[in-house]
């Protein structure tokens, strides 16, 4: 019970965040996340990754080292988030090389117009993608973290395309 209607203009948002983000709710959220994942294809049984067989792992993508993509305006914002890059660094065995390159920004300089009109890659964009590809070639496995953000998804964020925004398809 949050008492929203007892004193509707005197809410302590920090206390509300603590209540919503309690240990019990964290466990429920974790279980819901586990149960909502669907693996469509596991070619050559690559998953789950075996940390003992990986000496070098490439991580790329605009959301790989980004916390904000995991948060929404529909829940508590004062929560601790582990980025995919941090999670990988925490899980691999000591001595494993983790090569990170962003690869591209979430959206390109011409976005949102670039959803309708294809612009050529700039030299800087191509260079960043090339770095990510080189890291992938040198690695045992590559994790690519793509998607949207509150800038590209949400209320009042209508888009003309369901494709990944920016240069993410070029990176992939």
Give, region by region, the residue ranges found by the protein language model.
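C-terminal non-catalytic regions of proteins with extracellular/luminal or membrane-system context
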Residues: 5, 13-172
């Amino acid at each position: 019970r949050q008492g929203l209607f007892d004193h509707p203009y005197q809410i302590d948002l920090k206390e509300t965040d603590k209540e919503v983000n309690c240990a019990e709710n964290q466990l429920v959220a974790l279980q819901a996340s586990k149960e909502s994942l669907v693996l469509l294809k596991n070619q050559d049984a690559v998953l789950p990754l075996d940390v003992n067989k990986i000496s070098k792992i490439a991580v790329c993508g605009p959301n790989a080292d980004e916390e904000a993509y995991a948060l929404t305006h529909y829940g508590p914002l004062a929560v601790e988030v582990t980025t995919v890059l941090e999670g990988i660094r925490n899980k691999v065995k000591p001595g494993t090389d983790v090569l990170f390159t962003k690869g591209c920004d979430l959206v390109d300089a011409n976005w949102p117009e670039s959803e309708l009109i294809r612009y050529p890659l700039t030299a800087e964009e191509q260079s960043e993608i090339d770095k990510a590809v080189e890291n992938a070639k040198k690695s045992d496995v590559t994790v690519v973290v793509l998607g949207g953000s509150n800038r590209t998804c949400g209320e009042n964020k209508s888009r003309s395309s369901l494709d990944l925004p920016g240069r993410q398809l070029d990176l992939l």
